[in-house]
A protein has these predicted regions:
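Enzymes that bind and transform nitrogen-containing heteroaromatic metabolites
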Residues: 2-231
Length: 231
């Protein structure tokens, strides 16, 4: 009987250890995680690319593009950690594309071409139904219309004993934070002031929500801060 139960107990322990997390999320010193006037031509918004200048040079990012080279060191370490042990992603609709309202057709398949960088089931929050979209490289987009809790349950089921990564955008992360559903956040603070855009911290009291800084390290390009839920 014990031999039969051991794999089940082990699976339950692993599931308990899996996390819901935000990783490698770039933020300006004044809290902005995206620029203004995001569009098809400028998906990160005005000055948005500046937020990722710690990430773009890394070996991890180069490998995601199918390229060789790239920097190693602390920035690359955090970038790589963000991609490890991820069994499913959750994205807000804006992270999938610029289309608003009801889907006019199925032509839009995301910002990333035929092979997105996720490689696991990816759940997109939306108010408008759409059939699942299977892409090259293991990514399947599932469109969830019944809220953040439903999306998280689907993602946990798909991830099995691995982590669920919340990819953004700002509004999506804020919803999950307010619901106290995120276990940890890795924020990469860039030494820039944006002045406008989408501010991650507006209306949030992270201390009251139970988060505390458990690790921080600085490089030339970013200060990496790990916030973990304490209660």
């Amino acid at each position: 009987m014990l031999d039969f139960l051991t794999p089940l107990l082990f699976a339950l322990i692993l599931k308990d250890m899996s996390k819901v997390r935000v990783s490698a999320y770039s933020v300006s010193l004044d809290g902005y995680a995206a620029g203004t006037n995001q569009s098809l031509e400028n998906p990160l918004g005005i000055r948005g690319p500046e937020l990722f200048q710690w990430f773009f040079p890394t070996r991890t990012f180069k490998q995601m593009q199918g390229l060789e080279g790239g920097s190693t060191g602390v920035d690359d370490e955090w970038a790589r950690r963000g991609m490890e042990n991820v069994g499913a992603w959750i994205l807000g609709r804006n992270m999938f594309g610029p289309v608003r309202g009801a889907w006019p057709d199925d032509a839009w398949k995301g910002w990333w071409g035929e092979e997105p960088p996720y490689h696991v089931p990816t759940f997109v929050l939306t108010h408008h139904p759409r059939k699942a979209l299977e892409m090259k490289g293991g990514t399947t987009f599932h469109f969830v219309t019944d809220g953040i809790h439903s999306a998280l349950q689907h993602a946990k089921d798909a991830a099995k004993d691995k982590d669920v990564r919340i990819g953004g955008g700002v509004a999506t992360i804020q919803q999950y934070l307010r619901a106290k559903l995120i276990d940890e956040l890795h924020l990469a603070f860039r030494p820039i002031l944006m002045g406008s855009g989408e501010n991650l911290f507006v209306g949030l009291d992270l201390a009251t929500l139970g988060y505390a800084c458990t690790q921080h390290v600085s490089t030339e390009h970013a200060m990496h801060v790990l916030l973990q839920k304490q209660t």
